[in-house]
């Protein structure tokens, strides 16, 4: 049963958040929301432990479609970074602000960039593209993520500065437009650079929050050097080009690891 510790801990964390928010906010939705997400993630981990081929994809679809279709389109909640800025500026700790605090600001201290690997609805689509591992050298254009970050902040700030009326409706259409833009750029970059995760590496503004916190992540893939034969197979299949043979926190692209475990599946010696 020890092998099921990780999914049990992950489920316990999300259930704790669910109960805490339900009690403090007096809203049963939080119990459903975080319980559903926690169960979906735990299910994916259990399927991985049982060597199910599409374990991570199951969780991606369960969580990604729930947040995109149900929360975003049906409930009309902008769960993108613009939604976070919007609720932050209004001083309301709801929806996107809670989502960002749990999944993208403090959550990475526990599970690193796990959001990117198991729940992001943008990556959910991009992972269906043909370039599972990058076929070109990494580009030095990661600074573009800060441009997108600043633009999203300026956009929402402008709504308040110029006292735009019906901000809720504007934010809903910003969610739709923003997602269409992300998908267009993500698919375009994937084919341009032959890399499904090019958008994640160069443009995604959310990584401005994720990367610094992921440096301290408790949940990390580590290498048992007594088993490693330096075959390089782990690096060849890594979608984020992380050097998994280096256990230090300063390893190459260390804050990029999305916990997809493709490296562990490819390792012939089970060193990861």
What is each residue range found by the language model?
Residues 1-245, 255, 265, 269-272:
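Non-ligating segments of multi-cofactor redox enzymes
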Residues 247-260:
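Short linker/helix segments within small regulatory modules
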């Amino acid at each position: 049963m020890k092998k099921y510790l990780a999914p049990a801990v992950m489920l316990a964390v999300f259930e704790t958040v669910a109960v805490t928010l339900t009690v403090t906010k007096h809203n049963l939705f939080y119990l459903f929301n975080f319980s559903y997400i926690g169960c979906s993630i735990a299910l994916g981990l259990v399927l991985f432990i049982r060597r199910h081929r599409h374990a991570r994809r199951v969780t991606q679809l369960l969580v990604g479609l729930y947040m995109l279709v149900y929360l975003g389109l049906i409930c009309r909640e902008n769960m993108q970074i613009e939604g976070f800025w919007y609720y932050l500026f209004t001083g309301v700790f709801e929806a996107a602000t809670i989502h960002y605090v749990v999944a993208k600001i403090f959550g990475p201290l526990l599970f690193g960039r796990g959001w990117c690997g198991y729940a992001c609805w943008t990556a959910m689509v991009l992972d269906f593209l043909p370039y599972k591992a990058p076929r070109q050298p990494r580009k030095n254009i990661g600074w573009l993520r800060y441009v997108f970050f600043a633009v999203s902040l300026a956009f929402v700030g402008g709504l308040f500065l110029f006292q735009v009326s019906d901000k809720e409706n504007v934010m809903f259409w910003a969610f739709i437009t923003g997602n269409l833009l992300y998908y267009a750029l993500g698919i375009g970059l994937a084919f341009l650079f032959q890399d499904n995760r090019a958008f994640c590496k160069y443009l995604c503004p959310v990584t401005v929050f994720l990367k610094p916190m992921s440096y301290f992540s408790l949940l990390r893939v580590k290498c048992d050097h007594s088993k490693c034969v330096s075959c390089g197979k782990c690096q060849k299949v890594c979608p984020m080009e992380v050097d998994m043979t280096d256990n230090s926190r300063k390893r190459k692209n260390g804050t990029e690891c999305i916990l997809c475990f493709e490296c562990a599946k490819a390792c012939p010696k089970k060193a990861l």
